[in-house]
């Protein structure tokens, strides 16, 4: 049995990837600063470094390289997901619903900001229009699931 992805879960994957990428960038900055600090300390000492110190520097360099690779993979996954979601939204949704979904799930705006920008009440955009938009998208997601299974 194939699980049909819910529209809101599908769109939230974009934000999840965005958060993961941001966290990895922060970790990369910490590792980069640490590696510069370690190599600077070793250079300032002007003594021959031990193999243990070199191993720590190498291990840090490897972690940095792996993290950069992970970040690039996540960015590519997020871009692919955004492109796919963007195309589905355009095919599925009315202009108002399209605008709401882009503001919420691509620009990560809160409901208050969206309501002001769209000229509606908070309750209307966060409840009624949001549900309508998700329902429109859900129909297309389910249609695509049926096509993919054939």
Which positions does each model-derived feature cover?
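N-terminal positioning helix adjacent to the helix-turn-helix/winged-helix DNA-binding module
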Residues: 81, 96-97, 129
